[in-house]
Amino acid sequence: MVTSDELLPEARITGFKGVTRTSFCHVLNARATAHKYAESRGLAYKDMNLVVAHLGGGTSVAAHKNGKLIDGDNGLEGDGAFSTNRTGALPVGALVDACYSGEYTREQMHRKLNGLGGMMAYVNDNDVLSVYNKGLAGDKKCTEVIDAMVYQTAKSIGAMATVLDGKVDAVLLTGGIVHNDYIVDQLKKRVGFIAPVYV
């Protein structure tokens, strides 16, 4: 992941003094996807409002307004939706309790959040195609986790649409997970009311 420091001032405030939100998402891929989409429409990226969701080992969803990435999930450090091996946002109280339970070292907690979290934590597999196929074969837990990941990703996309005051030209999906037609179709069903969805 690469940073881009164009966040709105209000996007940086967390509600916990001393902890500031930073811009840390899949910037290069998100910008490249946004530019490619704009060019395909004969438009300039700097004249568009886009929500770009990178779906891969990590998930990050970002709001792009007039050529600037003004807000986005920090998927590496626990923002937004969970992904194949990252937890995404968690209930803070339960997380604090886990940190002070004596069960885990600091390093173990970091590993549980990034590497052993997300889909991996539930089905011991971080390969979307493998988990999807297990679901098709009747493993209900695999289907449940895929659907929950779609649900949380859709919530993040909706949140970024509000950052753009609902004025969204398109929702763009990118990253390795978009090769799964089921996930793309489910996301389109959930967020298609916001704007046209493109892969």
Residues of each region from the PLM?
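Predominant activation on well-ordered alpha-helical scaffold segments within soluble catalytic domains
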Residues: 30-38, 92-100, 107-114, 129-132, ...
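Conserved phosphate-binding loops in N-terminal lobes of ATP-dependent enzymes
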Residues: 1
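Adenine-nucleotide phosphate-binding core of ATP-dependent small-molecule kinases
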Residues: 111, 115-165
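Beta-strand segments within the central parallel beta-sheet cores of soluble alpha/beta enzyme folds
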Residues: 47-53, 108-115, 169-173
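Conserved active-site and cofactor/substrate-binding residues in soluble primary-metabolism enzymes
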Residues: 24-28, 32, 59, 89-93, ...
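Short, intrinsically disordered, charge-balanced linker/junction segments flanking boundaries
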Residues: 195-199
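Glycine-rich phosphate-binding loop of actin/hexokinase-like ATP-binding domains
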Residues: 4-101
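Glycine-rich phosphate-binding loops at beta-strand->alpha-helix junctions
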Residues: 168-190
